[in-house]
C-alpha cells in the first residue's frame, strides 16, 4: 500500500491499494460514517427530448460516498463501499442517491474520517510494512499428495493441491517414475507461484520422509528453487498440517515477523494459560474490562469483527486504556484458525502481567 497524501486537519488520507492484503486492511480502516472518494462508473439516465425513452449510459465520475455498508469480497478481490453520494465531479449526478464504490488492486481512494483512531493508523502502517515483507508459502507433502498455501496478512489461502497415484511397492520402477512426475509437477507449481507472488522462501513440511526425498530431488533438478526451501516436520498433511507449521513458530523463524503466525501463537498461549488455570489469561468482555481496570493487561487480543459490531466504542475504549498502560493491542483476523478460536472465546482475550483473582 502507498500513502499518497495526508491532510491531518481535515481527517483525510489518500492511498493506493496494491495487493489483496491492502484491500483487507482498507476493509478494517473504513467505518460507517466515513466519506470515501474514488473514480467510479455510474449508470446515468439520459433523455434527449420528451418524446424519446430514457437512454441509460455508464459514465466515469469522481464520487464521494458516505459509507453505510462496507464489504470485503476476497474471491473477487474487492472492497465495496455503499452509501449516499455526498460529492460528485459532475453536476448531472444527483447528491443523496446511493452508489457503491468498488476498491480493487490499483485503486486510488481517499478516506475522510471525523477522527482517525490509533488502530486505524496502525492498520495503515502495517499495510505499508507488509508490502516490504516477503509472503509466506507453506507446502505440506506426503506420498502422492501435496497442498500449497500462502500465509497472507488476512489469513491462510489454499492455492493449489497436487495428487498423483504412485502405485504399490515403494521401490517399484513404475512407482519411482510416477514419484518423479509428481515431484516435477509440484516443483513447477511452486516455482510459478513464487515468481508470480514474489516469494523468497518456501517451507516444505510433512509427516514422513517424502519431504526429504523431494528436497533432494530439488537439489538435483531445481537447484535455485532448492535454495529457497526450508524443511519442517508435521504429524499430518492438509490444512491441519499447514496450521501445525504456523503454530510451531517456523514461519516466524524464517520470516521473522508475520502477522498470522503471531496471532495464532498468541491465541494458543491464551488457551494454554486457561487450560492450566494459571490466572495469567482471561477472556470475555466483562472479565477483560476488569483486568484492564487493574492495569493487568500485557497483551489484548481483539477479534477484528468486534470493531464493526455493537460494542465497538466500548472495545475501542479498552484498546486505548491498554495502550495508555503500555500494553500491546493485537487485532486478530477472523480469517484463520486462531481467529476462529478467539471467536469461540467471545472475540476478546488478554494475557496478564499478574493475576487479578
From Swiss-Prot:
The keyword Hydrolase applies. Its main location: cytoplasm. It is an enzyme of class 3 (hydrolase). It is found in: Cytoplasm. Pfam families: eRF1_1, eRF1_2, eRF1_3. One of its GO terms (cellular component) is cytoplasm. Its cofactor is a divalent metal cation. SMART domains: eRF1_1. Its EC number is 3.1.-.-. May function in recognizing stalled ribosomes, interact with stem-loop structures in stalled mRNA molecules, and effect endonucleolytic cleavage of the mRNA. May play a role in the release non-functional ribosomes and degradation of damaged mRNAs. Has endoribonuclease activity. PANTHER family: PELOTA, PROTEIN PELOTA HOMOLOG. Monomer. The N-terminal domain has the RNA-binding Sm fold. It harbors the endoribonuclease activity. Belongs to the eukaryotic release factor 1 family. Pelota subfamily. This is Protein pelota homolog. It comes from Thermococcus gammatolerans (strain DSM 15229 / JCM 11827 / EJ3). The gene is pelA.
